[in-house]
Structure formats: C-alpha cells, structure tokens
Amino acid sequence: MTAVADKQKQRAYELDFLRGFALIMMIFMHSAWDIRYEYGVDTFGFLEADWFWAIVHPFFIVIFVGVSGICCTFSKNNLFRGLKLLGVAAGLALATWLITTYLKIYCLIIFNVLAMLAVSILLYSLIEKLEKTAKADPKLVNALIGMAGAFFAALGSKLEWLDYSTDNLIFLPVGFKMNSMPYMADYMPLLPWLGVFLIGCLIGRVCYSERRSLLPAKNKTAKAITAPVEFVGRHSLIIYLVHQPIVYGIMYLIFMLIRRG
C-alpha cells in the first residue's frame, strides 16, 4: 500500500462524506425555507408535507448527529472540543439575541445543533474520564452507552405525547414543552438527539475501534467525485456557521434586483 493510500485508509473518509452530504441537504432545506417563507415564493411545496418532517428531515439530522457521535470516539481531547463548541454556540446565541433585540430581525437561536453537540461531547468526555478512572470493562461501558442512547432517543420521541408543561426555561435545552416558548430560528433539544449521538458513539467504539476507515482506498475517479462532499464534512463547523448569513444575503440581493426590475 502506498503512503497516500495508507493515509486515506487511516482517515475514515466515509464519515466525512456522510457528514458533508447531510450538511449539504440541511443547507438546501434552510435555503428552501428562506425562499418559501421569508421571500414568499410559492415553491418547495414539500415543506408543507407531513412526510417531509416525519421522515426526510429527521433522516438527514440522524446522519449528521450520528456521525458526529462516531467521530467523537476518534478524538483524543473531547473536553477541549466540547468546550470550544460550547463557546461557539454561546457566541452565536448572543449574536442572534442582539440582532433580534436591536435590529428587529427575528433570528434568535438559544439551543441549536451546535449547543446540543457541545453538551453531548462534554457528556461523552465525562464518560471517557469515568471509564478510565474506574478501569471499567469497555464491553460494559458500550452496553451502558447503547442502552442510554436507545432510552433517550425513545423518550425524546414520546415527549410531545406526555401530559406536562413548564414555564422554567432551564428545561428548554432538554426538549420539554414550554408554556411560553420563545420564537427561535433554529432549535434542537437534547431529547431525542443526545440518544442518537450516543448510539453514534457506540458505533464508533465498536466498529471504528482502530480509528481507521472501514472501506478500501478510493481510486482517482471516486476520489474526484466525492472530494467536494468530503471537504464540506471535514469543515462542517465553519460551513454551518457561515452558510445561513451568506445564503440569506445572496437571496436578499437577488430578490431586491428582481423587485426593482
């Protein structure tokens, strides 16, 4: 095996591709939402369909969050990663609060996918620390992670059917129903998505224990085809952060020119 092929084999490029593909679809859905609801263009009717919100939308989020859980098992310092991402999420929340409050552009984001992933990564960091300190059997830890993931995912899917409500905003990140839910441009609670993340962690611990790709090295043609999507997957954080203002800005200019014309 050549040095290039060995390097490619060591990096689980299939995870980059899956995360990149999921993020591209999320960007498309955000763009479609802006066009239909922000600019009033009667298109992308699938956004009104129950099947889209019940199947398609969750499907891509499951891929993105699950792969994030898998990748978490590759990291040597999840505490740092989690704190860094939490700082980014807090900065985004502050920025959107200022924009919403003073510019009257209603884009408030309190707890979105970045905050959810940050808390999940920090939780997994704690699990790693406890596992190492207690010298626990990895198989037992895997079983506990799997059961916790399945429980949180199942509980999250049933929350809306439970007869309860609360006024305490401290429960907003968890996913509990709020009596006075603030309008948010994006929202992703811990339930059920922490469960999906933990299931991803389990897959990473079991299937990617050697931290290597499960697929053979790609040839030049396959590499050329998948490289753009993998690039998006490798740089998902920065692309996620900048895509909405960029897309919204481009659309604003386009529709401004159309209306003037």
Predicted ranges, named:
Residues 1-261:
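Alpha-helical transmembrane segments and their immediate juxtamembrane cytosolic regions
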